[in-house]
Curated annotation (Swiss-Prot):
Coiled coil: none
Signal peptide stretch: none
Annotated family: Belongs to the G-protein coupled receptor 1 family.
Disulfide pairings: C95-C177
Protein name, per record: Olfactory receptor 14A2
Glycosylation (residues): N3, N83
Listed SUPFAM superfamilies: Family A G protein-coupled receptor-like (SSF81321)
Organism: Homo sapiens
Topological domain ranges for the Extracellular compartment: 1-26, 77-91, 158-193, 259-267
Length: 314
């Protein structure tokens, strides 16, 4: 170890070293980032301002939108600036901060999605007691615990990762700091701390997954007992968006954080990282709003308040 030079900063490789392509990637990701930002902020605004959306389901959806905004805002602006300024460097502190926020918000999303599945379970399987069970205090507590556990996990995960020394190459073959890339340049002889963190993350994800699966088993068995097709369709329409969002998020998160690191990162690794960081914030608003009449009506009401009756013709 005496002749090993310790790393004092990192270089984020990104997707290309060609100047024109870097600018193209920067502009493309800027447009995607703005789309994710505006769509999620619109959902937050509608749920906050519209009285008819003051329900547990939309309360959790607003929390999910906040997490999406924060999650996409951690790596993408830095990537855009790097491409437009041709500067790939990031300090160790900046890398640690990026990893802390991304793991915290990602873990928070998993727990919020789990809380949303429980909300759907109570709404469909226990409709008469829904308002009693899912009261304001319970909803706030579930959301607070989700954010808190996410923050604690992110802190522990990041502390474990940066307790290791880094030496040799300072190049991170990604557009943001992720654990698999950092493991490749670690010169620590033991990785028990970080693998313990990965194990805890896997256990938390699997626990949430099991809770959601159990919730949907009860939900589907209840929905199939509804005598009318219209009633079944309405019940399923509130569940499928959540199930789709969770499936996409948990699969991409697994491939980014929990898969064993390879010696040579592939294009697929970077593509999965893009899907994981960009797809949920862009995909979630579309999934939850495209066939959601409540959200459409709330948007019309907001436009009417802002522009008058002409909003009917927009």
């Amino acid at each position: 170890m005496a002749n090993v030079t310790l790393v004092t900063g990192f270089l984020l490789m990104g997707f290309s070293n060609i100047q024109k392509l870097r600018i193209l990637y920067g502009v493309l990701f800027l447009l995607i980032y703005l789309a994710a930002l505006m769509s999620n902020l619109l959902i937050i605004t509608l749920i906050t301002l519209d009285v008819k959306l003051q329900t547990p389901m939309y309360f959790f959806l607003k929390n999910l939108s906040f997490l999406d905004v924060f999650l996409v805002s951690v790596p993408i602006p830095k990537f855009i600036v790097n491409n437009l300024t041709h500067n790939n460097s990031i300090s160790i502190l900046g890398c640690a901060f990026q990893l802390l926020l991304m793991t915290s918000f990602s873990a928070g999303e998993i727990f919020i999605l789990t809380a949303m599945s429980y909300d759907r379970y109570v709404a469909i399987c226990c409709p008469l007691n829904y308002e009693v069970i899912m009261n304001t205090g319970v909803c706030v507590l579930m959301a607070s615990v989700s954010w808190a556990i996410g923050g604690l996990f992110g802190t522990a995960y990041t502390a474990g990762t940066f307790s290791m020394p880094f030496c040799g190459s300072s190049v991170i073959p990604q557009f943001f700091c992720d654990v698999p890339s950092l493991l490749r340049i670690s010169c620590s002889e033991t990785l028990m701390v970080i693998y313990a963190g990965i194990g805890v993350g896997a256990c938390l994800s699997i626990s949430c997954f099991i809770c959601i699966v159990i919730s949907y088993i009860y939900i589907f068995s209840t929905v199939l007992k509804i005598p009318t097709t219209k009633g079944q369709s309405k019940a399923f329409s509130t569940c499928f968006p959540h199930l789709t969002v969770f499936t996409v998020f948990i699969i991409t998160a697994y491939f980014v954080y929990l898969k064993p690191p390879s010696n040579s990162p592939s294009v697929i690794d970077r593509l999965l990282s893009v899907i994981y960081t960009v797809m949920p914030p862009v995909f979630n608003p579309v999934t939850y709003s495209l066939r959601n009449n409540d959200m459409k009506c709330a948007l019309i009401r907001l436009l009417q308040k802002t522009y008058g009756q002409e909003a009917y013709f927009i």
